Amino acid sequence: MHEKDDLPQDSIADGIENDDESNGQEEEELDPDQGTAFVDSKEDMFVDAPEELNFDTPSKEALTTDDDDNDDLGTHFNIEKGDWEKELAGLQEQFKLLTGENDLTGEDGNTTVDIVSRFSKFLKTAKEERIQHEVALKELHGVISGRDDEIADLTTKISELSSSQPVSEMGDQAQNLEHLEAATDRIMVSLSNVFGEGELQYGSSISEKLAHLENRVSFLGAKYTEFYYGADQLRKCLASDVLDLSFQEDFGSALGAACSELFELKQKEAAFFERLSHLEDENRNFVEQVNREKEMCESMRTEFEKLKAELELEKTKCTNTKEKLSMAVTKGKALVQNRDALKHQLSEKTTELANRLTELQEKEIALESSEVMKGQLEQSLTEKTDELEKCYAELNDRSVSLEAYELTKKELEQSLAEKTKELEECLTKLQEMSTALDQSELDKGELAKSDAMVASYQEMLSVRNSIIENIETILSNIYTPEEGHSFDIVEKVRSLAEERKELTNVSQEYNRLKDLIVSIDLPEEMSQSSLESRLAWLRESFLQGKDEVNALQNRIESVSMSLSAEMEEKSNIRKELDDLSFSLKKMEETAERGSLEREEIVRRLVETSGLMTEGVEDHTSSDINLLVDRSFDKIEKQIRDSSDSSYGNEEIFEAFQSLLYVRDLEFSLCKEMLGEGELISFQVSNLSDELKIASQELAFVKEEKIALEKDLERSEEKSALLRDKLSMAIKKGKGLVQDREKFKTQLDEKKSEIEKLMLELQQLGGTVDGYKNQIDMLSRDLERTKELETELVATKEERDQLQQSLSLIDTLLQKVMKSVEIIALPVDLASEDPSEKIDRLAGYIQEVQLARVEEQEEIEKVKSEVDALTSKLAETQTALKLVEDALSTAEDNISRLTEENRNVQAAKENAELELQKAVADASSVASELDEVLATKSTLEAALMQAERNISDIISEKEEAQGRTATAEMEQEMLQKEASIQKNKLTEAHSTINSLEETLAQTESNMDSLSKQIEDDKVLTTSLKNELEKLKIEAEFERNKMAEASLTIVSHEEALMKAENSLSALQGEMVKAEGEISTLSSKLNVCMEELAGSSGNSQSKSLEIITHLDNLQMLLKDGGLISKVNEFLQRKFKSLRDVDVIARDITRNIGENGLLAGEMGNAEDDSTEAKSLLSDLDNSVNTEPENSQGSAADEDEISSSLRKMAEGVRLRNKTLENNFEGFSTSIDTLIATLMQNMTAARADVLNIVGHNSSLEEQVRSVENIVREQENTISALQKDLSSLISACGAAARELQLEVKNNLLELVQFQENENGGEMESTEDPQELHVSECAQRIKELSSAAEKACATLKLFETTNNAAATVIRDMENRLTEASVALEKAVLERDLNQTKVSSSEAKVESLEELCQDLKLQLENLRVKEEKWHEKEVELSTLYDKLLVQEQEAKENLIPASDMRTLFDKINGIEVPSVDLVNGLDPQSPYDVKKLFAIVDSVTEMQHQIDILSYGQKELNSTLAEKDLEIQGLKKATEAESTTELELVKAKNELSKLISGLEKLLGILASNNPVVDPNFSESWTLVQALEKKITSLLLESESSKSRAQELGLKLAGSEKLVDKLSLRVKEFEEKLQTKAIQPDIVQERSIFETPRAPSTSEISEIEDKGALGIKSISPVPTAAQVRTVRKGSTDHLSINIDSESEHLMNNNETDEDKGHVFKSLNMSGLIPTQGKIIADRVDGIWVSGGRVLMSRPQARLGVMVYSLLLHLWLLASIL
């Protein structure tokens, strides 16, 4: 990167060594800026290197694309790149031939920036040389005017001498002497006008004056020859016919023409440089802007790729939704089919209903017939009953004795409880009859009859008993034993009748359910399976449909969310497209301007090179090589012609050998500029390639736009179709819903009718069954009458057995009665009747058992409550334990913090820290305080939680208080304890609040201390700065100020100790907080102990609270902090006074110079401060014992708290005492410091006054010495040497013109040699200087002409290229405008499609709501279907049994249990059922009816989902097309940004050229630096430079003519003074020759590297030294002898000499990254480091050529790698 920087600098160094040897050390002193120009240019190269690297390496992404068009562009780019490289190689070879630089071989990395920098260097050197020549011309003007005066005086004197010689010499000797003296006086007066007023003081005699005049005349002759020779050279350089004619008369015309031409060239050069720098800046800015736009476009590409991926995902989602919607459509179709099936089923039901009606009619007929039979049976029953009554009456009349038997029979029936009522009556009758037979055995016949009757009754009873036993056995098989015992036979029969009715209903419902299940379209496998499996399948299908509805709803929600996200993304993309279109418009405008500027630059460069006049006017990019070659050939020919015409022999070539070095430098700069031109053309080609790529991308955008339009049309069509489909689906759905509701109502009505009919049938059947039962009973009663007769006989036989059993029973009863009488009952329960007694005993036993059960229940409740209370107590205990753990952790943290504070204090005692560390420690302590506060807040939170827990416990205890007496007592105890704990907690909370207040106060105090510490730090830093200034300015008083700084450092150490003490105090505050935390932990422990033992804890808690109050009072004591604040205030006041004294010292030193006195040593009292600080630290570190310990018992807690309070009090006392001593020591130290500083100030004031008096004395002595030197020099000269001096001057002029001219041109002296040799021969020094300056002026004019021609050619080439670029940019802008219009149309279409999408989204929302409703219904129906399937399977299994027999009750119960598991919204409106029918039956019918509706809804939902998926897929396609369009636009924007950056670089290069040419007179407004205006300004500057060069040539010719006239006059004078030559030859020739040889043979200064010589100067004055040398208005050549020469230069060229260019104009200022405003505040440190690395790297590269070579090799390899990767 820096390889091209070394070559021009080496050539510059050689040129300075070989060409500028005559300038010497004097010009180095007067023009120190001359050598630093190259350093500045070097800095330019280092600063511009990163931009060049960015400029030379185009991005790989911009050149390598995946399309075939990009491959073609790559090949085209490689071809143009090879052409530019060839052109660059040719330019470099031509530059080598012109400059003679052989070291440039192998350079491939030269860029336009490097070439422009070389041209700028060359123009700088030309400007410097031009200024020197202008100064020399002014000096020559002064000398010529003096010489004219001298010639006039000499002519007058010669005329007087010639007129006075014919007169007698002896007689007129006195008069001649008087005339000679007058002539010498006049000559001296004339010389005083040239050499100064000191000429009048040389010599008092005529001989001395004449000797002095001889020396002056010889000097003037030498100067005249030099001026004449220089004017001749200028005349030859200017080469005008007018000058050739006028030069013989006046050689000053050549000088005037040269001056004017150089002035014009200088103006043109400055304008050209300014323009060129401006163009370079613009070009650089443009390239940067292009790079930024490239990066933006790349980011946009990535974003678009992401959007593409998202759109693809959305497409897949849309396809999925479409599929789901298609499935929903199919399901909807299935639902329609189900609707048709339901209609068919409804028709079947109507037919079935008609059949049922016919059956009802038949059953009514059967009922009527049964009623007839019922009437007949009733008649027969009445007859039979009449007969039976007669029989019973006869029996009653005949045997009264049977009543007792009947009574006994009743008693037996009651005891046994197994016989029927009729049997009991018979038994009682038999018992009565038996008793009657026993009592009265009146008639045997009557007894026989009675026995027969009894036998008949017994037979009847036995028959009846057998029937009853059979019924009981049958019923026992049906019912359980418990049910059999609990019910009698009649009830059992009644229950059987009711069950029969229910079973008939269930069978009917079962049949209906079976028919409904059969009517449902089930698979073949399920249709053949059982009813339970069918119901299970229906339930599973219902649940599955419900899940599908949920899934569809979720998908619809996700689709809606994705659509909303896509809408947002579309809006963002639209905004980004608008921004990109705006940026594209801007880039098009800039690209158009850049192309126009480029073309104009190329055109102007071609015009300035002069090729336009030769027929080379129009050039394309392919002819630039030929144009540049021809321009360089022309320049080379001009240089050769000028060199051949100027000198005709080898001696002249040797004389201009030094000028060839300068030309080498010029051509190296030209070569660099041409390289930059090639780079610019390369960039232009890159821009053209990028524009082609942009055009291709625009075409691609158009294609994508067409595709987008097609996609939009398709999407619109699809959206229209979707809308139609959705509207149709909605209409169909609404119609289906309405049909479904109608069918439901019809089905409900039919069902209700069917249910009513079924109920009627059931009622009729029940009545029929009742009649049948009555008939059966009557028939059975008739049969039983016969059986009763037989039973009477059996009863007689059993009578005896019963009597025996009764006797046994009587004995048992007597025993039982005796045992009952023995039982002792309460008074309330006592009674005489044993049965009542037994009953009461049974009731009492039952009551006792119930009381026991209740007591057990209450006990269990109490136990449960106690368990709950214990669990809650355990929870509170665990919470308290957690609080204790938190407190223990807080204590550990606090102890750790205290240990860390102790370690910090120990470290502070060992090492003396600075104030910054003290502030950092204070901040760390503050942070630790914050941590402690945080822990305290956590403890408070824990305490609050404990209070809450306790309050919860209290509330729970209050609730449990009213349950049991024991629980109430425990509750009261716990409540009391809790209240006590609550009071203690409130007290602890108050103490913690007080502690918080104290901590807040301490924090405020610490904040004030930290602020004071910061102020102290500021004061100390200011003191350090002032002391450093004193050290720098007062070099002679360095020791005293060092002692003062030591004293200040000691005081700073004292301040540091004070800060350490403050930090110790802060540590003590932290320790106090730790103690507070320990106390709080102990309080918590005490609270826990109080929970166990409440008696002793109250008194001890009061003691703890008192101790805490004492600690709180101690902490609130702010005496120590107030003392610290007072001490710090006093300290800061004293330090402010010290600061004021130091400022007075520095101000006096700054005003009056160096210090010249010694200040008193400051006393070092650091030992005393250290001892006091150690005492203070020891006092701070003294802590009361057992402060950190935790008391094991409650007594020890109180004692430890008391000890802690006492320890804190003692600590405060010790701190106060030690702090007072420390404050007094600090005050004494500050007082001593004040004394020392006041003494130092007085000393400084005295020193300043003494220095001022010494300076005045030195000035007076210098004036005296100067006057003495003037008088001595005047006495040394004699007027008698005037004639010899004139002859020597003429001879010296001739010799110098003939022999010594070349030696004088080649003469170069170093600093020391120049001063030493100037003491021996001042005339020769001035002659060599003038000749050298004239030659430099001529060479500079030639160089300026050559560079102007080169600039003209390059400007013309650049103008043509810029014109081409502007045309291309206009084309690109037109295409871009079209693309923008198309994009706007696409956006309108997109907005319309978005509106459509929004409408579709609204429809989707509606469908979503419908789907949600349907999903809920579907879930319910699905559950019902599953349950129905199970029921159906069970019914299928039981179908055969149901046909023959009724369904068992157990199966029906399981069926209805499963139905109850299904949730149905409403079952009240089930058609075909009676409203009084059971709920389970209604639910079953509702489930069966809802299956078809759910299937239909599922189909509708699946269809809607498919349609939504299709719409989503279409919208995904639309979004993807829009993203592709935005990506294409981003690529075009990237390419346009690239072109803009390259044009900005080109414009910045032109601005730099203009800046170099215009210097401080800007031609273009800096606020409006457009490229076209820059090109125009550059053209104006070049033309002005050409005009200036022409005027300088004419002026040089005029000066040459003036010199020729003066030479003629000198020749005339030399002829007249031939008689004086013989006397002066022996005196002047030999010393002159010796001096010249010695001067010419002086060794040159060692040719060291100029970079090493310039390094220090460049490092010290990068900003202060301007690249243009500022010539002083008076240049003096100081000599060691008494001969002094001062040449006064008029102020005509002040505006040229003082035209100092600032570093900012040249780009030499190193601007930091932080000053640029581009770096945020977070990255300032990194930016400073980068700046430091940059500057240090620049210095290293300046001082180490190996590093430069390494960097160049690395950059070359990097370029090769990039080219390989691109190709």
Swiss-Prot record:
It is a single-pass type IV membrane protein. The chain crosses the membrane at residues 1749-1766. GO terms for cellular component: trans-Golgi network membrane. Its main location: Golgi. Keywords: Coiled coil, Golgi apparatus, Membrane, Transmembrane, Transmembrane helix. Expressed ubiquitously in roots, leaves and flowers, and, to a lower extent, in stems. It comes from the Eukaryota. Residues 1-72, 1177-1198 are annotated as: Disordered. It is found in: Golgi apparatus, trans-Golgi network membrane. Residues 276-436, 493-516, 570-590, 684-805, 845-1082, 1251-1310, 1362-1424, 1522-1542, 1603-1630 form a coiled coil. One of its GO terms (biological process) is vacuolar transport. Disruption phenotype: Increased sensitivity to high concentrations of NaCl, KCl and LiCl, and also to mannitol-induced osmotic stress. Altered localization of SYP61 and abnormal partial secretion of vacuolar proteins to the apoplast. Enhanced root skewing and epidermal cell file rotation (CFR) probably due to microtubule destabilization, thus leading to abnormal cell morphology in mature regions of roots and the base of hypocotyls. Tethering factor involved in vesicle fusion at the trans-Golgi network (TGN) thus being required for efficient protein trafficking to the vacuole. Implicated in resistance to salt and osmotic stresses. Modulates the cell morphology (e.g. epidermal cell file rotation (CFR) and cell expansion) in mature regions of roots and the base of hypocotyls as well as root skewing, a process leading to root movement within the soil in order to maximize anchorage and nutrient acquisition, probably by regulating microtubule stabilization independently of their orientation. Interacts with SYP41. This is Trans-Golgi network-localized SYP41-interacting protein 1. It comes from Arabidopsis thaliana (Mouse-ear cress). The gene is TNO1.
